[in-house]
């Protein structure tokens, strides 16, 4: 299993993501700089981490979505390679058109940083297969622009297609229909604002995020 973490100027969760991937696979991921035009040969899994890429200038994720490496990420996603975007990575995926919708300023206009309860809406995807349908899990969030928005038709479509992966249970940021994570139509791209990589060790508060990586990386015990 070869994994890769995309690193942008301003990424600050890339090392956390690398630790999560290495914990599950036993191998350190390739850390791929945003200026690269290709991924390491044989890359099986791609992660776009949290942070403040390019200082969140213009819009969160807008400049990163136009980085050279994103073309290779999009091509890999089109071939079915799993792609996980967390927090700023989710913002990048929406800006790049790999996921529907947009992430706006939190409804309360405050940075939210705490562990929140989520409901698993779709337990059939490659990312969520280790969870039960309707299961409640606890995952940390840390964001200012996590308010998910899409027009009503798009929301109805992704709901009807089972593409809402996770939903907030306590109205964290004003997201439409409390959506916390969204899948692409093929199910191999997941964007989510909560940070599963920060929930892989009991010493750090819980392991509810670990199962996402175990399922996605195909090594679930």
Curated annotation (Swiss-Prot):
Gene Ontology cellular component list: cytoplasm
Keywords per UniProt: ATP-binding, Cytoplasm, Glutamine amidotransferase, Hydrolase, Ligase, Nucleotide-binding, Purine biosynthesis
Domain Glutamine amidotransferase type-1: 3-221
Record's subcellular location: Cytoplasm
Pathway annotation: Purine metabolism; IMP biosynthesis via de novo pathway; 5-amino-1-(5-phospho-D-ribosyl)imidazole from N(2)-formyl-N(1)-(5-phospho-D-ribosyl)glycinamide: step 1/2
One Pfam family linked to the record: GATase_5
Oligomeric and partner information: Part of the FGAM synthase complex composed of 1 PurL, 1 PurQ and 2 PurS subunits.
Function: Part of the phosphoribosylformylglycinamidine synthase complex involved in the purines biosynthetic pathway. Catalyzes the ATP-dependent conversion of formylglycinamide ribonucleotide (FGAR) and glutamine to yield formylglycinamidine ribonucleotide (FGAM) and glutamate. The FGAM synthase complex is composed of three subunits. PurQ produces an ammonia molecule by converting glutamine to glutamate. PurL transfers the ammonia molecule to FGAR to form FGAM in an ATP-dependent manner.
Name of protein: Phosphoribosylformylglycinamidine synthase subunit PurQ
Organism from which the protein derives: Sphingopyxis alaskensis (strain DSM 13593 / LMG 18877 / RB2256) (Sphingomonas alaskensis)
Gene that this polypeptide is encoded by: purQ
């Amino acid at each position: 299993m070869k994994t890769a973490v995309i690193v942008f100027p301003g990424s600050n969760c890339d090392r956390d993501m690398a630790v999560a991937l290495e914990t599950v696979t036993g191998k350190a991921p390739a850390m791929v700089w945003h200026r690269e035009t290709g991924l390491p040969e044989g890359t099986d899994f791609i992660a776009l981490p949290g942070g403040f890429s390019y200082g969140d200038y213009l819009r969160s994720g807008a400049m990163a979505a136009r980085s050279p490496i994103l073309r290779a990420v999009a091509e890999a996603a089109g071939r079915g390679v799993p792609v996980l975007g967390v927090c700023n990575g989710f913002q990048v995926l929406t800006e790049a058109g790999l996921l529907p919708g947009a992430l706006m300023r939190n409804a309360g206009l405050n940075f939210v940083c705490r562990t929140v309860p989520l409901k698993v809406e779709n337990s059939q995807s490659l990312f969520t297969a280790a969870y039960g349908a309707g299961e409640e899990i606890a995952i940390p969030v840390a964001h200012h622009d996590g308010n998910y928005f899409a027009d009503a038709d798009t929301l109805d479509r992704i709901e009807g297609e089972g593409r809402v992966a996770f939903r907030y249970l306590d109205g964290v940021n004003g997201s439409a229909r409390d959506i916390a994570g969204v899948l692409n139509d093929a199910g191999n791209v997941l964007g989510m604002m909560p940070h599963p990589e920060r929930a892989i060790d009991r010493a750090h508060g819980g392991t509810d995020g670990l199962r996402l990586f175990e399922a996605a990386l195909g090594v679930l015990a």
